[in-house]
Regions:
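Acidic, serine/threonine-rich low-complexity regulatory regions at protein termini
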Residues: 1-104, 108-292
Length: 292
């Protein structure tokens, strides 16, 4: 991966008068995100677990995506929820009858971090069909926070997707498709192999290739932002395509349907109806990206 240069993108120049764009700090912010990625969960933590497996994790995440949609939460919340789960499971063994409790407590924590109006603890017990009571959720919340040493914040693929869409000036449909690819990969334990920045870059690349409003290729602006060339993205792109296309026939059997259903909605441009492109050859294109 190439070292990112200190560059100013054209989109930042255009938005320099918008205080919410924080254009004076955005380069430093994404340098921080890159450094913080090194604290991501262990890739092979299931080898340490004795009573759960990747299939159970996938079903849990699928259910959480459904709950996340039902509660109309912000997109960063589901990413943070799954990160909390994986970070906890990287350090602690858990019984399968406590896995859903871990998931709902992680969602409870993430929502209080990301949402303006997080759900009440009573809502969390309700969505589990009262399999756990309020005290169970609160106890698990404290257990998680102590294990993570109260360090909740962690950069996700969503942070990178937002920036990539702006830098590439991607249409809304491409941004939605990249979000779909990235959120669908939250369910796949094997995808923990890839850093959030790499996963986001690969999802964005595939989305731009699939979208009729985008040129076929990896914009140089995106390469400069992430530090990844199209060649470096190829293995992750291939994995995403596999899980969405070849494994699609097994999703119903594995009960992984919530993400596809969520992104079939019109407010997400119905992007889950389409297939994920399969890249045969990396192709680099050039787009204007640097401010004068």
């Amino acid at each position: 991966m190439k070292r990112q240069r200190d560059v100013r993108y054209a989109v930042d120049k255009d938005e320099s008068d918008d205080p919410q764009a924080v254009t004076d700090y955005v380069v430093d912010l994404y340098k921080y995100y890159r450094d913080a990625e090194e604290k991501r969960p262990m890739e092979l933590y299931m080898e340490f677990q004795q009573d759960i497996n990747p299939k159970m994790r996938g079903i849990l995440v699928d259910w959480l995506v459904e709950v996340h949609l039902k509660f109309k939460m912000l997109q960063p919340t589901i990413y943070l929820t799954v990160q909390i789960i994986d970070r906890y499971l990287s350090a602690k063994q858990i019984d399968r009858n406590q896995l859903q409790l871990l998931g709902v407590a992680a969602l409870f924590i993430a929502s209080k971090y990301e949402e303006i109006y997080p759900p009440e603890v009573a809502d969390c017990t309700y969505i589990t069909d009262h399999a756990y009571d309020a005290q169970d959720v609160l106890d698990m919340e404290m257990t998680i926070l102590r294990e993570l040493d109260w360090n909740i914040s962690s950069p996700s693929a969503h942070h990178w997707l937002v920036r990539l869409a702006r830098v590439a000036r991607a249409p809304e449909s491409a941004a939605h498709r990249a979000e779909y690819f990235a959120q669908r990969m939250l369910q796949e334990y094997a995808m923990l192999e890839y850093k959030p920045s790499l996963l986001a870059a690969a999802a964005a690349y595939l989305a731009m290739v699939a979208d009729e409003g985008c040129d076929d290729g990896w914009p140089r602006a995106c390469e400069r932002l992430t530090g990844y060339t199209d060649v470096e993205l190829y293995p992750c792109c291939k994995a995403i395509s596999y899980h969405i296309n070849r494994a699609a026939k097994d999703d119903a059997k594995r009960q992984l349907v919530a993400c596809k259903k969520k992104f079939s909605r019109h407010d997400f441009s119905t992007v889950s109806f389409g297939k994920c492109p399969v890249l045969k050859r990396p192709k680099l294109i050039d787009l204007p990206d640097l401010a004068d």
